[in-house]
UniProtKB/Swiss-Prot annotation:
Residues 1-16 form the signal peptide. This is Envelopment polyprotein. Residues 646-650 are annotated as: Important for correct targeting of the glycoproteins to the Golgi complex but not for heterodimerization. It comes from Rift valley fever virus. Keywords: Disulfide bond, Fusion of virus membrane with host endosomal membrane, Fusion of virus membrane with host membrane, Glycoprotein, Host endoplasmic reticulum, Host Golgi apparatus, Host membrane, Host mitochondrion, Host mitochondrion outer membrane, Host-virus interaction, Membrane, Signal, Transmembrane, Transmembrane helix, Viral attachment to host cell, Viral attachment to host entry receptor, Viral penetration into host cytoplasm, Virion, Virus entry into host cell. Residues 131-153 are annotated as: Internal signal sequence for glycoprotein N. InterPro entries: M_polyprot_prcur_phlebovir, Phlebo_G2_C, Phlebovirus_G1, Phlebovirus_G2_fusion, Phlebovirus_NSM. One of its GO terms (biological process) is fusion of virus membrane with host endosome membrane. The record marks A153, E154, A690, C691 as: Cleavage. Residues 777-783, 819-830 are annotated as: Fusion loop. Residues 17-130, 604-673, 1181-1206 are cytoplasmic. The chain crosses the membrane at residues 583-603, 1160-1180. The gene is GP.
Length: 1206
């Protein structure tokens, strides 16, 4: 007995009875009159996925209460059907709201119960009473119609329909009895589904207007031709074209669905018998174990009314919309965005379906017949159905039988005040009672600024194609019309109209920046040594207008370093002796001599005025001067003696006198080397670094073995090497067991960056509001008491629920407006203007805003492994990357920058970066960037509700029946275009990093970088014999004592793919270059500290070494630059510690002059000319003429006098 009792108590499917405890008489009952066990499974299928209370307390006839679980619903339902004569069972949840959820459904608007309850009240209490108590009673039996979803409606007269009240579709005859017309007691699935909570909120707000099926039967809306699209034979049928652009959802148990098509007519889709519509309403599925409803499912949320407003000349415009469904609004040639959207529409007389950009509704209450509901009671005395009844039920009454004021009618009617103001209300026993239908009246919508009365109005989810309302940010494109000129003073870039505020020029991994007041022309310094070496220079320019940055590649030819780096009065112009012209040499000598004379004269005058024993002070100066003159005379005499000795040996002088006449020519022989003492001074060793940094793999990490002619070496361990400067290479040399077995691991420093380490970030975009409004009179819909004043932003009015179910950002408002007849209301209390506002993205793109919490150095390295394969990696401080031979990590010693907290940055995923001149804000603030911020790009594009907003962003202006909503948001795209990088702030230039992967800063900094190479049992094979090659020296260009270095180029002819290695005699210098089959020119960066380079290398590709002489003249480039410039340059990696050195320079000067003797002679000439000590020198041969300008003058004397012109 207890087991049976437990099973019976587990019942959750019950018939709900609402009992209201008021002083007046009222009774509400739930009932059923038959059972149908075969329909239990179908009912359970529709209920088992619903949310129900976890625990229920149930009691049988109030005797005993037992807790049970809702999971027992299915078995308990079968037990109830099998049992007869059970007593009433009452169930409730943990809190009173659970009782309501069994009828209404849980907060997610789902239904749990499977019975329909109906309320009956006294006529005088209709429209005035409220619910006071709730109870649930399970009856012994369930009615067949009770297996439909629950409909809970506060208005008991929703089934009292206007017009004929027919809600059936042709061909579905099984429900004609209950749907033709809809009655208080009958079940009509085509109509009942419209009253399910949350499914059709617009119709439920205007439920006393006609449904689409009712409008068709009342000849308000016509049927389509053909009226129905049979899915069984719809393959290729054009009737499905419009249906397929709609996004719909159908329950599993409907066989047909209907909608308002593009022509403003009703169309439908249906399945053959025993088939039901699938979830998307596009296919038919055979159903077993469940009965199919013969009603038709509505695919749109709409209501209809009678109207005579003509819409044939009506033209509407939807901003930015190209197509809606199958309607083409305008031709769009640009980029389109396609999505399913909830779009309002309306149908007018003599018009097709009209889609609306927004829906503004207003209702005017009137005294037309459709505004009233009339009813009588079944079994009523002298009623139309006066037979005995077992239940209390109502029956609709035709209002046309009631007499109007001053008119006649066949029946006597009574009703509320509104009814009695238009109809004769009898004081006698009435046949029917009539009252004003809540929410009825003439509904008008605003179309093109005019209020018009539509036949039907509603919402549907349909495909919408929109053009991008604002042009997307253009990519950084090459400026094809810009002009570049390689001028001696810098690289000049001229635009074709836009003004340039800043620019970045890069070449060979070195970048320089420049900023100025906006102008159509900008002059940039040449990066590195590109001015003399030539080549391509990439320039990235920032504009001052609303367009983004642009770029251009300038090509400069190689030029003479002396021409491009020369000057008359400057530090590098002075020390670059090989570049002096006659003018610059004269200026230098004159300036230095004048400075010396002036200093001595001033010193003498000061000492003389102070009378501080000037003779005692001058005596040392005199002695020094005399000593210098003595040395000078001795050197001149020595030179004259040597010249005379040569003349005597060749026979030009006899007894100390020159021989007159023209002696016979004497055969010339190679000169005897008599200046060995002086030539010793030319043996000056110059330092160079070829592979910038080179180490040889030690035996501790190398193990080699020989297998025939092949050698295999295994590397396992760690090697530490300094990174090369930008453009240079660091090399690890691996030698096999043979002399010709050498391979290299080369790591080239491609570029260096001071990159931004990002902190917080958010996504933002261009967002605009869209507002929907509807004015309802007092006591209509949700406009009760002071509800409007207490309306919450997250509370959506019922008529906007269909739109409000989306996940976009939205808010709701209610504004009290005027009431009374002047405002179209019966009630003089204020009406309610309900507003639903949702935000939408204007552009189909989003921007990311971030700040930089730190600036870190990063190197881009190009690694060429032992087999010649090349890979490029990026490494930051203390970071590592794995390779096929092991791993490489980077250690940096550098300083960052500060002062970047006062601005933030914007990133466009495809267009680059921009700077914002305001600090990063952690919370959205009105009037600043990021008023609306989201956590992802997709959230911005969909204006998702998870986005954060600053308060009070939307301003409202209510105007009785309509409303304007506006925002004044900061447009991040305008900010992006205005601040597009590169830009200069705080004497630092910010630009996009290489590959557009971040933001970098230029600050003239330097880093000390070390690379740690970790080898993990990596094998290197030396297979067969090495290839042979020949190399010839081409040229040497660049600078000395500089970070850019010099570039040595060789012409290499090889029989195969391999590598050329070269070293000097003592093994301190190495050059490593790849060799390929054929002849190819290869270059490598070296660093020298002397201007005159002459170094002999031994090169080899196959172990057979041959000599190679590298010789050339280098110049100094700005060794001293104390000017302060805004912007800066790219970071220098491992700057050369050796600066310009006087002794190295002097040794180079002697080498350039041809030796110490020629250097002495040249300076002696200049000194002689300056001091006037000597007027001429005697030499005997023209080939002894000095470089400073010795011109031989022949005279008719025995001797040859040479006039000195210095």
């Amino acid at each position: 007995m207890y087991v049976l009792l437990t099973i019976l108590i587990s019942v959750l499917v019950c018939e709900a009875v609402i009992r209201v405890s008021l002083s007046s008489t009222r009774e509400e009952t739930c009932f059923g009159d038959s059972t149908n066990p075969e329909m239990i499974e179908g009912a359970w299928d529709s209920l088992r996925e619903e949310e129900m209370p976890e625990e229920l307390s149930c009691s049988i006839s109030g005797i005993r209460e037992v807790k049970t679980s809702s999971q027992e619903l299915y078995r308990a339902l079968k037990a109830i059907i099998a049992a007869d004569g059970l007593n009433n069972i009452t169930c409730h949840g943990k809190d009173p709201e659970d009782k309501i959820s069994l009828i209404k459904g849980p907060p997610h608007k789902k239904r749990v119960g499977i019975v329909r309850c109906e309320r009956r009240r006294d006529a005088k209490q209709i429209g005035r009473e409220t619910m006071a108590g709730i109870a649930m009673t399970v009856l012994p039996a369930l009615a067949v119609f009770a297996l439909a979803p629950v409909v809970f409606a506060e208005d008991p007269h929703l089934r009292n329909r206007p017009g004929k009240g027919h809600n059936y579709i042709d061909g579905m005859t099984q429900e004609d009895a209950t749907c033709k017309p809809v009655t208080y007691a009958g079940a009509c699935s085509s109509f009942d589904v419209l009253l399910e909570k949350g499914k059709f909120p617009l119709f439920q707000s205007y439920a006393h207007h006609r449904t689409l099926l009712e409008a068709v039967h009342d000849t308000i809306i016509a049927k389509a031709d053909p009226p129905s699209c049979d899915l069984q034979s719809a393959h290729g049928n054009p009737c499905m074209k419009e249906k397929l652009v709609m996004k719909t959802h159908c329950p599993n148990d409907y066989q047909s669905a209907h909608y308002l098509n593009n022509d403003g007519k009703m169309a439908s889709v249906k399945c053959p018998p025993k088939y039901g519509l699938t979830e998307d309403c596009n296919f038919c599925r055979q159903m077993t174990g469940a009965s199919l409803k013969k009603g038709s499912y509505p695919l749109q949320d709409l209501f209809c009314q009678s109207s005579e407003d003509d819409g044939s000349k009506l033209k509407t415009k939807m901003k930015g919309v190209c197509e809606v469904g199958v309607q083409a609004h305008k031709k769009c040639d640009g980029q389109l965005s396609t999505a399913h959207e909830v779009v309002p529409f309306a149908v007018f007389k003599n018009s097709k379906k009209v889609y609306l950009d927004k829906l503004d509704l207003k209702t005017e209450e009137n005294l037309l017949p459709d505004s009233f509901v009339c009813f009588e009671h079944k079994g009523q005395y002298k009623g139309t159905m006066d037979s005995g009844q077992t239940k209390r039920e109502l029956k609709s009454f035709d209002i046309s039988q009631c007499p109007k004021i001053g008119g006649h009618g066949s029946k006597k009617c009574t009703g509320d005040a509104a009814f009695c103001s238009a109809y004769e209300c009898t004081a006698q026993y009435a046949n029917a009672y009539c009252s004003h239908a809540n929410g009825s009246g003439i509904v008008q919508i605003q179309v093109s600024g005019v209020w018009k009365k539509p036949l039907c109005v509603g919402y549907e989810r349909v495909v919408v194609k929109r053009e991008l309302s604002a042009k997307p940010i253009q990519r950084v494109e090459p400026c094809t019309t810009c002009i570049t000129k390689c001028e001696p003073h810098g690289l000049v870039v001229r635009s074709t109209g836009f003004k340039i505020s800043s620019a970045v020029a890069c070449a060979s991994g070195v970048c320089v920046t420049g900023s100025q007041s906006p102008s159509t022309e900008i002059t940039l310094k040449y990066p590195g040594i590109s001015q003399s070496s030539g080549g391509d220079i990439g320039v990235h320019m920032a504009h001052d207008d609303q367009s983004v940055s642009s770029k251009i590649v300038a090509h400069c030819p190689p030029q003479d370093p002396c021409l491009v780096h020369g000057c008359i009065v400057c530090a590098h112009g002075l020390i670059n002796y090989q570049c002096h012209t006659a003018l610059s040499a004269f200026v230098v000598v004159f300036v230095f001599s004048s400075i010396a004379i002036i200093c001595l004269a001033v010193l003498y005058r000061v000492l003389k005025c102070l009378k501080i024993a000037p003779r005692k002070v001058l005596n040392p100066l005199m002695w020094i001067t005399a000593f210098i003159r003595w040395i000078y005379k001795k050197m001149v005499a020595r030179v004259a003696h040597n010249i005379n000795q040569v003349n005597r040996e060749i026979g030009w002088m006899e007894g100390g006198q020159l021989v007159l006449g023209n002696p016979a020519p004497i055969p010339r022989h190679a000169p005897i080397p008599r200046y060995s003492t002086y030539l010793m001074l030319l043996l000056i060793v110059s330092y160079a670094s070829a592979c910038s940094e080179l180490i040889q793999a030690s035996s501790r990490i190398t193990t080699c073995s020989t297998e025939g002619v092949n050698t295999k070496c295994r590397l396992s361990g760690t090697a530490l090497i300094r990174a090369g400067s930008v453009g240079a290479e660091a090399c690890l040399m691996l030698k096999g067991v043979k002399e010709d077995q050498t391979k290299f691991l080369k790591i080239k420093t491609v570029s260096s960056e001071l990159s931004c380490r990002e902190g917080q970030s958010y996504w933002t975009g261009s967002i605009s509001p869209k507002c929907l409004s509807s004015r309802r009179c007092h006591l209509v819909g949700e406009c009760h008491v002071n509800r409007c004043l207490s309306w919450r932003d997250n509370e959506t009015s019922a008529e906007f629920s269909f739109v409000g179910e989306s996940t976009t950002m939205r808010e709701n408002k209610c504004f009290e407006q005027c009431g009374g007849w002047g405002c179209g209301c019966f009630n003089v209390n204020p009406s309610c203007l309900f507003v639903h506002t949702y935000l939408q993205s204007v552009r189909k793109e989003a921007l990311r805003v971030f700040n930089c919490i730190d600036w870190v150095h990063k190197l881009t390295l190009e690694i060429t492994d032992f087999d010649g394969s090349v890979s490029t990696i990026d490494l930051g401080a203390s970071s590592s990357r794995f390779t096929n031979w092991g791993s490489v990590s980077l250690s940096l010693d550098a300083e960052g920058i500060s002062g970047s907290n006062s601005f933030s940055f914007i990133e466009s995923p495809s267009k680059g970066y921009a700077i914002v001149d305001e600090p990063f804000s952690e919370i959205p603030r009105q009037g600043f960037l990021g008023e609306i911020r989201c956590n992802s790009e997709s959230s911005v594009l969909s204006a998702h509700e998870s986005c954060l907003r600053a308060p009070n962003l939307i301003s409202y202006k209510p105007m009785i029946d309509q409303l304007e909503c506006t925002t004044n948001l900061i447009d991040p795209f305008v900010v992006f275009e205005r601040g597009s990088l590169p830009q200069t702030r705080n004497d630092k230039t910010f630009a996009a990093s290489k590959g557009n992967r971040g933001v970098q800063a230029f600050s003239k900094g330097s880093v000390q970088a070390d690379l740690t190479l970790m080898f993990d049992n990596f094998e290197v094979d030396f297979v067969g014999a090495a290839v042979s090659c020949d190399a010839a020296f081409l040229n040497l260009t660049g600078c000395y004592s500089c970070n850019a270095g010099a570039r040595v180029c060789l012409s290499i002819t090889s029989t195969g793919t391999g590598s050329l290695s070269a070293h000097n005699k003592d093994g301190s210098l190495h050059i490593v270059l790849p060799s390929e089959n054929g002849t190819k020119d290869q270059c490598q960066i070296l660093h020298f500290t002397v201007p005159e380079v002459e170094e002999e290398f031994m090169y080899s590709c196959d172990g057979d070494e041959r000599p190679l002489l590298v010789k050339g003249t280098l110049i100094a480039i700005d060794p001293f630059d104390d000017r302060r410039e805004a912007g800066g340059e790219s970071t220098v990696v491992n700057p050369k510690s050796g600066s310009w050195n006087f002794f190295d320079w002097f040794s180079g000067l002697m080498s350039w002059f041809g030796g110490p003797l020629k250097l002495y002679s040249s300076f002696a000439c200049m000194l002689h000319y300056q001091l006037g000590s000597f007027s001429s020198l005697y030499i005997l041969e023209e080939q002894a003429s000095l470089k400073c300008g010795l011109l031989p003058l022949r005279r008719p004397h025995r001797s040859v006098r040479v006039k000195v012109i210095c």
